[in-house]
Amino acid sequence: LAVYGADKVIVVDNPVLETYRTEPYAQALTAVINEYKPEIMLVGATAIGRDLGPTVSARVQTGLTADCTMLEIGDFPLVAVPGKEDEQKHNQLLMTRPAFGGNTIATIACPDNRPQMATVRPGVMQKIAPIEGAKANVVEFNPELKENNKYVEIEEVVKAVGNVENIMDAKILVSGGRGVGSAENFGMLKELADVLGGMVSCSRAAVENGWLAQDYQVGQTGKTV
């Protein structure tokens, strides 16, 4: 983490956290926030993040913007209201995400509560070039995790093995949408992708028509590539 810009790494190491469960993870992350009081808390918009993020935001009584596709630091409101310029707040986290089924883009801020929380789609942020020789201050933090009636007991973990290609790893994508017309016609795109050494991807319309699985969807409501 240090080589990618982290100055401090907070480690919570507890056997209870070996396998993800909402309650102990929420307790741990809530304790980290209460102890270190960050201005911003980002969580990956993964299956775990979409469960953990809202739970933690409710416990620390702040807002959360889900599935963000862009993050910026700026002023809120974006344009000062005439006569109320002194009410404009600076250095706010501006969180952009698709809304209304991807038909519009909304920019959201959380000016009155901290931390400012967001879940961010994988692939949105580009890693910086590694900083050779960088070191981070590693802090071990051991909050008390109390077992309560929200705990669940894991009986068995079954790992599914899928054969779906990860389009986020592709250097070349051949993408099709509604105009392709059918699942069969995507075979032509697959042939072209094979020639180019790439993969096939698609739009939301193709997924809704059942032509390709959602794993291949790109765009505001799909994967960021």
Where are these regions (language model features)?
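N-terminal glycine-rich FAD/FM-binding segment characteristic of electron-transfer flavoproteins
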Residues: L1-V225
